[in-house]
């Protein structure tokens, strides 16, 4: 309810330095009066030069800060509060948290009375921005009307956060560090004053201090920029050094992050030309509003295109003006939200024309720039009660629409989802809270959650293993044992027997019992491919659940069976590519094509060792090189230090390195030094 942006306080430095020029000159041409003539160096002719004016640093600071609060009060009328404090020899309060002073006219009239600092002010330590920062902390402790109402209702804990924007000019980073330390100290002192039992205000939960270091145009500053930094649990500080003419753009960029705003540029607005009323031209107007106006209209499956305008650092969404036309409510999409809007440049002619057009009771539809032939209307601008709103129209699937069927996939209708099996997986993965906290870093539920869904084909056309559960009576119990985490020796023997029976069926040429519409027996090559895919999917399932040594023994047996069945060669089978397209799972390993026929003896397969699998006929080049290097290294003597070191200790390399006495007594070292001297001579 009470966010950090509910309270914002501007502290304006009113010292002598802010009376100097910003060094950005504006040429003024007068309609009346004699123009100033300037004779060039050649002296042959003269040219008319208009008067050049320049704003002071104080004027730039006041204009930009008032523009900041105008945007806040336009978008959040009566909800967000902004205060101003002017600091010179003391802190001057411009307005309070009262709604009667939270308006543009009150702040503008007060700033006119303050005026620009005088250059005749003597340089003194009494003129400081610290007075204003102290007053800002005291103002944060004062409750707003909403906080007072919450106190009367009976709220015991009222959040109190705020932001302080200090516009000043510091000499270097040391001065900035001193300013931060003083602000943090005063913040702690203020919280100590309002602590019980005094209760002279609200305790400040957190403060965000933004320091804008202002310098004239073309002047180098010794203060470096710094991103948001946590000084203490109560204070975050960020520092920005900007030229005085650019302070408005900087505050516009900051306000979008402070209040979570977004920018929209309305393009192709037809307007009459001032010089020629019979013709019209297209203009663009940039408006600000809450970011939710874009996020709510899009939904999760649609995004609006953004761009960065020249001279800015933030993104803006471009929407095209749609010619107003009469249409009924049935022609419009449902509205999902409305938000206040305000123009970025309120004094420009295009902005003024758009505001007057809307305040006269007209509505404007905004459409997304077309990428296809269809027209998508995403927003609508209208005014009610003197305020302008942007309405977000739903262009994604509405909550009132019927949800699409689960079988309607992106590639068309999918009718073979394994929905019952997925329900069983949910039941197996269901967790309930425990009364006592489990011991250890990883609970049993988290371990189960990580292990169960590692391999689950979503559709029936990508798996052979799970399609045969109804046809093979032993397969469901076999799969249950594979997934079983605490497999014992008896379970391993049962699985070994089933693998043995499966290989015997493959050796006899028995076809797998698929449900087929006709009783035609598949060809021999096709039957082998089915068994080969069955083996591969079964191997992947065992490999993902290999938690015990019994699982690993099963995996080695199955790998031996696959190797003997001929599933290790790169010879291409004519029908294998076609089978792969509809029988292979997406999570299956890389395909291994068959070669020559295997032996029919199942007992020899199960007893085959790894040495037989890696025989000379199947060894790779890397295996042969590794064996040669290993045999060559065995012929060399081991490191003498390792041979002399007792077992369990570490041998030290160069034990006498760095020992000066040892170096002097070593004749080899002396000889080498003499040789070096002779070479140099």
From Swiss-Prot:
Belongs to the multiprotein complex Integrator, at least composed of IntS1, IntS2, IntS3, IntS4, omd/IntS5, IntS6, defl/IntS7, IntS8, IntS9, IntS10, IntS11, IntS12, asun/IntS13, IntS14 and IntS15. The core complex associates with protein phosphatase 2A subunits mts/PP2A and Pp2A-29B, to form the Integrator-PP2A (INTAC) complex. Belongs to the Integrator subunit 13 family. This is Protein asunder. Component of the integrator complex, a multiprotein complex that terminates RNA polymerase II (Pol II) transcription in the promoter-proximal region of genes. The integrator complex provides a quality checkpoint during transcription elongation by driving premature transcription termination of transcripts that are unfavorably configured for transcriptional elongation: the complex terminates transcription by (1) catalyzing dephosphorylation of the C-terminal domain (CTD) of Pol II subunit Polr2A/Rbp1 and Spt5, and (2) degrading the exiting nascent RNA transcript via endonuclease activity. Residues 574-619 are annotated as: Disordered. Coiled coil: none annotated. Phosphorylated. PANTHER family: INTEGRATOR COMPLEX SUBUNIT 13, SARCOMA ANTIGEN NY-SAR-95-RELATED. InterPro entries: Cell_cycle_regulator_Mat89Bb (IPR019355). GO terms for biological process: cell division; centrosome localization; dorsal appendage formation; flagellated sperm motility; meiotic cell cycle; oocyte nucleus localization involved in oocyte dorsal/ventral axis specification; posterior mRNA localization involved in anterior/posterior axis specification; regulation of fertilization. GO terms for cellular component: cytoplasm; INTAC complex; integrator complex; nucleus; perinuclear region of cytoplasm. It comes from the Eukaryota. A motif (Nuclear localization signal (NLS)) lies at residues 606-612. Its main location: nucleus. It is found in: Nucleus; Cytoplasm; Cytoplasm, Perinuclear region. Keywords: Cell cycle, Cell division, Coiled coil, Cytoplasm, Developmental protein, Differentiation, Meiosis, Mitosis, Nucleus, Phosphoprotein, Spermatogenesis.
């Amino acid at each position: 309810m009470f966010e950090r942006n509910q309270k914002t306080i501007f502290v304006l430095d009113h010292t002598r330095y802010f009376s100097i020029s910003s060094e950005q000159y504006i040429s003024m041409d007068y309609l009346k009066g004699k123009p100033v003539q300037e004779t060039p160096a050649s002296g042959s002719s003269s040219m008319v030069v208009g008067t050049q004016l320049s704003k002071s640093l104080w004027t730039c600071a006041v204009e930009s800060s008032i523009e900041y609060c105008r945007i806040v009060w336009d978008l959040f009328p009566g909800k967000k509060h902004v205060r101003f404090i002017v600091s010179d020899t003391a802190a001057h309060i411009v307005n309070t948290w009262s709604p009667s002073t939270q308006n543009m006219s009150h702040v503008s009239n007060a700033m006119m009375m303050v005026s620009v600092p005088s250059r005749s002010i003597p340089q003194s330590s009494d003129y400081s921005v610290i007075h204003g920062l102290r007053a800002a902390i005291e103002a944060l402790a004062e409750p707003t009307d909403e906080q007072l109402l919450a106190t009367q209702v009976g709220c015991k804990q009222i959040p109190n956060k705020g932001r302080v924007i200090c516009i000043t000019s510091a000499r270097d980073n040391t001065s900035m560090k001193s300013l931060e330390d003083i602000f943090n100290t005063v913040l702690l002192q203020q919280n100590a004053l309002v602590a019980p039992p005094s209760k002279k205000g609200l305790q400040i939960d957190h403060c965000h201090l933004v320091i804008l270091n202002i310098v004239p145009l073309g002047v180098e500053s010794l203060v470096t920029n710094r991103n948001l930094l946590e000084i203490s649990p109560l204070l975050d500080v960020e520092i920005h050094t900007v030229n005085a003419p650019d302070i408005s753009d900087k505050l516009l960029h900051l306000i979008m992050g402070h209040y979570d705003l977004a920018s929209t540029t309305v393009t192709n607005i037809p307007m009459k030309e001032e010089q020629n009323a019979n013709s019209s031209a297209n203009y663009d107007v940039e408006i600000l509003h809450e970011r939710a106006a874009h996020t709510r209209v899009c939904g999760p499956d649609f995004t609006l295109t953004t761009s960065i305008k020249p001279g800015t650092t933030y993104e803006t969404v471009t929407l095209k003006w749609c010619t107003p036309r009469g249409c009924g409510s049935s022609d419009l999409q449902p509205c999902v939200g409305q938000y206040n809007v305000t123009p970025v440049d309120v004094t420009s002619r295009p902005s003024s024309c758009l505001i007057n057009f809307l305040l006269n009771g007209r509505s404007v539809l905004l459409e997304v720039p077309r990428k296809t032939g269809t027209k998508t209307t995403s927003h609508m601008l209208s005014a009610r009660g003197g305020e302008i709103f942007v309405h977000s129209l739903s262009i994604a699937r509405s909550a009132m629409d019927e949800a699409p069927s689960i079988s309607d996939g992106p590639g068309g209708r999918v009718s073979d989802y394994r929905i019952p099996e997925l329900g069983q997986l949910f039941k197996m993965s269901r967790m309930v809270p425990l009364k006592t906290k489990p011991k250890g870093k990883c609970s049993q539920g988290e371990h189960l959650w990580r292990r169960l869904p590692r391999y689950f084909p979503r559709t029936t056309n990508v798996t052979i293993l799970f399609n045969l559960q109804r046809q093979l009576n032993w397969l469901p119990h076999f799969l249950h044992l594979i997934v079983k985490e605490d497999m014992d020796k008896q379970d391993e023997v049962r699985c070994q027997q089933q693998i043995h029976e499966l290989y015997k069926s493959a050796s006899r040429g028995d076809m797998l019992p698929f449900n087929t519409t006709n009783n035609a027996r598949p060809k021999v090559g096709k039957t082998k491919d089915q068994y080969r895919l069955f083996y591969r999917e079964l191997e992947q399932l065992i490999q993902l659940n290999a938690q015990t040594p019994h699982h690993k023994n099963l995996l080695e047996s199955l790998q031996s069976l696959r190797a003997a069945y001929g599933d290790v060669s790169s010879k291409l089978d004519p029908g294998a590519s076609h089978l792969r397209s509809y029988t292979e799972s997406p999570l299956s390993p890389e395909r291994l094509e068959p070669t020559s026929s295997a032996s029919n003896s199942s007992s020899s397969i199960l007893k085959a060792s790894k040495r037989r699998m890696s025989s000379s006929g199947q060894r790779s080049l890397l295996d042969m090189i590794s064996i040669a290097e290993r045999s060559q290294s065995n012929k060399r003597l081991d490191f003498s230090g390792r041979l002399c070191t007792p077992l369990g200790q570490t041998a030290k390399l160069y034990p006498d390195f760095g020992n000066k006495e040892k170096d002097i007594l070593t004749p080899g070292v002396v000889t080498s030094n003499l040789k070096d001297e002779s070479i140099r001579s």
